[in-house]
Amino acid sequence: MEQQQQQQQQQQQLRNLRDFLLVYNRMTELCFQRCVPSLHHRALDAEEEACLHSCAGKLIHSNHRLMAAYVQLMPALVQRRMADYEAASAVPHATAEQLETSPSRSLPSGNLGKGGAG
């Protein structure tokens, strides 16, 4: 049991690291494309450096705000999903009970199988 919990914890840590690296790589790519128009020099000039600092800061700040909103909304979202799940699992049960207690209906013996007016 202990080993299984450790494996789950390691898997969660790997998922967190992967998610972080995906965000970091995307941010790096986006800011580099916006702020470094040419690769003629080895070092960044002051304008490029300021642009990168501003771009990364803006994306990090946005990410923090999104995560705060996500953390705030998550309990309500989980609660709603649980209610939906419970309602969905109750519907088939109720339908089965209705089928067992309701009298069977027979089809009307009208013009079945005959095409339209005659």
Curated annotation (Swiss-Prot):
Belongs to the small Tim family. Residues 89-118 are annotated as: Disordered. Component of the TIM22 complex, a complex that mediates the import and insertion of multi-pass transmembrane proteins into the mitochondrial inner membrane. The TIM22 complex forms a twin-pore translocase that uses the membrane potential as the external driving force. In the TIM22 complex, it may act as a docking point for the soluble 70 kDa complex that guides the target proteins in transit through the aqueous mitochondrial intermembrane space. The gene is TIMM10B. GO terms for molecular function: metal ion binding. Its main location: mitochondrion. Component of the TIM22 complex, which core is composed of TIMM22, associated with TIMM10 (TIMM10A and/or TIMM10B), TIMM9, AGK and TIMM29. Disulfide bonds join C31-C55, C35-C51. GO terms for cellular component: mitochondrial intermembrane space protein transporter complex; TIM22 mitochondrial import inner membrane insertion complex. It is a peripheral membrane protein. This is Mitochondrial import inner membrane translocase subunit Tim10 B. Residues 98-109 have a biased composition (Polar residues). It comes from Bos taurus (Bovine). GO terms for biological process: protein transport. A motif (Twin CX3C motif) lies at residues 31-55. Keywords: Disulfide bond, Membrane, Metal-binding, Mitochondrion, Mitochondrion inner membrane, Protein transport, Translocation, Transport, Zinc. Gene3D superfamilies: Mitochondrial import inner membrane translocase subunit tim13 like domains. The twin CX3C motif contains 4 conserved Cys residues that form 2 disulfide bonds in the mitochondrial intermembrane space. However, during the transit of TIMM10B from cytoplasm into mitochondrion, the Cys residues probably coordinate zinc, thereby preventing folding and allowing its transfer across mitochondrial outer membrane.
